[in-house]
């Protein structure tokens, strides 16, 4: 960043005879001494900005001396006429980059505006004078031996580039060289590709296109169509139209039926009324077929027939058994018979009587001292 360089200007009346020598030396490139009435600028800043605060204090002290000195020597300075000459200096970090003396300049008669950052403005109480930006650029180009600023030619260059790009796009469109998105194909930089990608790219470029040209004049000729073939073709087309119309009609009927079924419960009578209407409208369910029931129980077995159905054969009724119910065959057991022994066929009532029966009838392992017999 450029540091603010404080300058001290002090009017110095030069009546010394050495001033003539200074004027002569200016023609040979030496330092030019200021004329009477001009200001001498002294740069008080280092290359790195060291000692800036000290110089400010000295400037503050010299300011009072300068005012006092101006009051004393106001008379002789006003007597000498000053030449209308403007000296511009470009300072950056305390170093003077260029100096240009302009004998004539143009003052811009416009309204108040913010000063350009390219203008050199001193901190002293001097009148502000504006210089046109074009003239200032010309001075900079002369001092730095640079070419004129290319900013004026930018709009024209952009228009030319757009026209060239549009022309290249139209040419690629005619040749069919656009990509899938309709843009120009970008050139592939092989330096950015890997070795494998470079090899695949070269292989694709070396191989011919797999597309084959279509035969123009060769091939078998199309067979001639007779009247019979034309009639068959028309018949097949008519059948296809009829089938398509039939399918459309069936689909339409199915859609209407489905809509009426879904819209029926939302009628005026509600779901119950719609359900009752559907029940009333349907045919009565067929009566159940006559059924024969057979029941077997402790009191006996029964066979039931529906009313109006005759029995196939007359059933002979058995006489009821007379006498008391049979009892257990084991001597001394008062319990009634519950089942028969699988080996002897005797009536038994429990497992204990079963073992006693085996011992008595078949001579089993149970002896006379068996606990079963004792119980």
Curated annotation (Swiss-Prot):
Pfam families to which the protein is assigned, alphabetical: PAPA-1, zf-HIT
Subcellular locations according to the entry: Nucleus; Nucleus, Nucleolus
A single BP term in Gene Ontology: telomere maintenance
Zinc finger (HIT-type): 324-355
SMART domains listed in its UniProt record: PAPA-1
Phosphoserine modifications at: 114, 116, 144, 147, 149
Entry-linked InterPro entries: INO80B/Ies2, INO80B_C, Znf_HIT
Subunit relationships: Component of the chromatin remodeling INO80 complex; specifically part of a complex module associated with the helicase ATP-binding and the helicase C-terminal domain of INO80. Interacts with RP9.
Name recorded for this polypeptide: INO80 complex subunit B
Species this protein is from: Mus musculus
Classification of source organism: Eukaryota, Metazoa, Chordata, Craniata, Vertebrata
